[in-house]
Amino acid sequence: MVYSNNDVIQDFGSDLRYLKLLSKEFPTIASASTEIINLQAILNLPKGTEHFLSDIHGEYESFNHVLKNGSGNIKRKIIEVFGDLLSETEIKSLATLIYYPEQKLDLIHKKEENIEEWYKVTISRLVEVCRKAAFKYTRMKVRKALPKDFAYIIEELMHRGPKELDKEEYYNEIIETIIRIGRADEFIIEMSKLIQRLVIDRLHIVGDIFDRGPGPDIVMDTLLNYHSVDIQWGNHDVLWMGSAAGSEACIATLIRICATYSNLNTIEDGYGINLLPLATFALDFYKDDDCTAFKPKIKSDIIYTENDLKLIAKMHKAISIIQFKLEGEIINRRPHFSMEDRLLLNKINYEDGTVDIDGKIYKLKDSNFPTINPKNPYKLTIEEKELMEKLKSSFLNSEKLQRHVRFLFSNGSMYLKFNSNLMYHGGIPMNEDGSFKKVTIDSSGISYSGKAYFDRLEILVREAYFRKNNPIAKQHGMDITWYLWTGPDSPLFGKDKMTTFERYFINDKETHVEKKDPYFKLEDNEKMCRIIFEEFGLNPDVSHIINGHVPVKLKEGESPIRANGKLLVIDGGFSRTYQGTTGIAGYTLIYNSYGLLLVSHDPFESTQKAIEEEKDIHSTTMVLEKEVERKRVRDTDDGEKLKFQVKDLEMLLDAYRSGLIKEQR
């Protein structure tokens, strides 16, 4: 309540005990009043800027650049401050310095003749940009973000008033001293990093950090050190999470994907996992097999020897067969997954090299299966069992992988509601009529749908990793984690089946078809979005769904804006594989106090060109929604929490003034 009536003493009831605890933190009327004033002031600040990225797929260079430039947000700040004062070339140079301060300084030192003058001008400009980036935060919040070595100096320079002529010499002397004692480079680096931090208040990653790109581990290291981030798990993410938990099916699938895209370095160098046992196994059992159907896809910027490619192909085939066997074990163990159509090893005629799929006979492209027993095709050989034990041990004992996956659990979830936005990676299983599909995922026969399905899946995924003292619950959780990768009613996958076997072994492309969930047909339907908002407890009139997973094919006329702006598809398009299909490098989203901005990006060339030639990603910004009144902290989820704190403190004031609680002076 707002304290306004001195004649009324509240009936505090059960709140009194809580207020006594609160009084330990605010022991006097003065301290409680000061906190109320502070919180009330914060509620009236502009809301912080949120940055949404999705589907990074291990492409760390593109990801790092978009993160550093805030989807163009830093350049916008520079233009707001210096738009009429600096040339386009000067703006580009200043932006590049802020993105890559260490590397850019190296180049500056080689070509700048009057480095001291350059330092003076550059430091002054950085201070102005930093002031602009920090204006919407309290001094306390900015102070917490300041680098320790320069905290006092930066704070002094940032709060320099435009009319403080008497202190002009004071501020100039600070900058000149920084230069004179040889700390200018360090100061510029820290200022640049501070600007990067201040332009984005919260980062949302809407799934798929992992996949075929060369550096998911580098992306994860970056996120671990980011000041405020949440993650909505994608299908590729749960595959790595399941592998870190010890799911052999996830491990085999993960290795197969890395082999497909000649990206085994991520496993070996990125996470220190030894793949020599797999190489040895593959050479033993497939030494006379050229494994044509399993030749890896080669990246244009990496050179492989012929022997390298032959070995990867053999490893690729070996782990693929093991994957099919392990998947068969899960499908037979969990009949409620309803995935019997994926049991194909027992449908092969090993004598004539054909397979029966849905009553139709297909010739196999490859019929050499030295490790399959036709009478018991899903049984691992002794050597395969030993191999998987070694690989599992390596995954379980990779300190870096375990650290990254723990971060995915602590900062991630199946979905997130935040400031009237609902974020999830794929879709919500639906029936053709737009109703939520009921799905049975365990032997209890209990069905789940909509939000309850997401909540139940998240519990089970967490059990896969954390229920080490309960082998049955852990195994069920690991099987569910694998199901989220490939299952017909997985919200993260969104298709009726994954036709991995058919793509390897059958030429007929009709067998490769994967039918999308009805959700994806209905995602342009505003009524469906409103039903989803109500299911998740959000106001349909002001909320948005923010989706990843499916690349937007701009070339074919697709739009990322669906259902009259209620659903936004922001597949980042970082994966180079999709850029030929989409026509761009995908979308990111900015949500600031003025509204929603959708940013489309052209492909990123390289970090080297970004630094040396100052080639930023060319981005086009579209204003989706503009607020009539600027959004304040009071209009956000954090604002609601602060309002409750204010209410509690006002109750504490009443308790002090009514004598129910004594001040501790």
UniProtKB/Swiss-Prot annotation:
EC number(s) given by UniProt: 3.1.3.11
Catalytic EC class: hydrolase
Cofactor (UniProt): Mn(2+)
Keyword Hydrolase among record annotations: yes
Xref: SUPFAM superfamilies: Metallo-dependent phosphatases
Residue stretches in coiled coil: none
Biological processes annotated in GO: gluconeogenesis
CDD domains, alphabetized: MPP_superfamily
Reactions catalysed according to its record: beta-D-fructose 1,6-bisphosphate + H2O = beta-D-fructose 6-phosphate + phosphate
A Pfam family hit: FBPase_2
Family named by the database record: Belongs to the FBPase class 3 family.
Protein name in the entry: Fructose-1,6-bisphosphatase class 3
Organism whose genome encodes this protein: Alkaliphilus metalliredigens (strain QYMF)
